[in-house]
Curated annotation (Swiss-Prot):
HAMAP family to which the protein is assigned, alphabetical: AcetylCoA_CT_alpha (MF_00823)
Single biological process term from Gene Ontology: fatty acid biosynthetic process
GN (gene name): accA
Protein name per Swiss-Prot or TrEMBL: Acetyl-coenzyme A carboxylase carboxyl transferase subunit alpha
Organism, as annotated: Syntrophomonas wolfei subsp. wolfei (strain DSM 2245B / Goettingen)
Subunit-structure text: Acetyl-CoA carboxylase is a heterohexamer composed of biotin carboxyl carrier protein (AccB), biotin carboxylase (AccC) and two subunits each of ACCase subunit alpha (AccA) and ACCase subunit beta (AccD).
UniProt similarity note: Belongs to the AccA family.
Pathway of action: Lipid metabolism; malonyl-CoA biosynthesis; malonyl-CoA from acetyl-CoA: step 1/1
Catalytic activity, reaction form: N(6)-carboxybiotinyl-L-lysyl-[protein] + acetyl-CoA = N(6)-biotinyl-L-lysyl-[protein] + malonyl-CoA
Residue ranges constituting the CoA carboxyltransferase C-terminal domain according to the UniProt record: 32-293
Keyword Nucleotidyltransferase: no
Amino acid sequence: MVKRQFDYEQKVQEIREKLEELNNLSSNMEFDLSQEIESLEEKIENNRERRYKNLSPWEKVLLSRHPERPNSNDYIRYFCEEWIELHGDRHFGDDSSVIGGIGRFNGQAVTILGYRKGKDTRENLQYNFGMPHPEGYRKIQRLLLQAEKFQRPVITLIDTPGAYPGIGAEERGQAWAISQVLMTLSALEVPVIAVVSGEGGSGGALALAVADRLLMLSNAVFSVASPEACASILWKELERVEDMARAMKITANDLQRLGIVDEIIEEPLGGAHLNFPEMAEKLKKALQKHLGEILSQDSGELLEERFQKLRKIGEFRG
């Protein structure tokens, strides 16, 4: 049976509740079990630390999909002193699974683009589970060109299972829309920093990942397709999804070793959702550092370095 949810924290919470009951019981019956309870709590924390430092790639996939994981909305609200969301692709409509606009980050006007997942059923339906349509990618391209025109740096936040694979999306040119974003980002004459904050799936994620710097949260994943899709296609066995997650090299550590990711932002113990302020502050400081480093570069130097960075990806080293 393939595990579909990372439920370790739930089990820890259940044990803590039992300990709390035991503590109350000992108080009522005048037994002093405080030392034993304290010792057990210390063991729980030590076990948690070991557990989270040794997560398998598949467990990181599950953690990256956690329904309470911070989304692009959360980070934008934390980062920006001012924020104006912009809508529409000026061709077909407005895709709510893509959030984009102008913000003031650390006193600097920036364009921020990201994918938007929901935290409950209503929001997931509204945002199409974070899967953009072609109009979403056209909105991204429009705002990228606007950022270049007004010389605003671009920050992208990536958390999507992939582009929406529906018939309507294909009829409206899904692949073409993604390719236009890739082409635009490759030649954009302003600094671009991309952050894989959760699930980075397929071409949908790749569309916002062409950047001067690529940052990744420690429990995020980034891959050409989901492990489930690869297991179904290559092995015809969904049960081998954990083997596929391992083989695909989709974790932040794997991708940094391969030279794709520039920096890993360590998440709080248990995941970004358990301590959002700490996670957001770490990411904010990393963005400030990288933005400060590349803002001083002229556009020609920036484009050349971006080109060389992209050319090295997938290069065979014998």
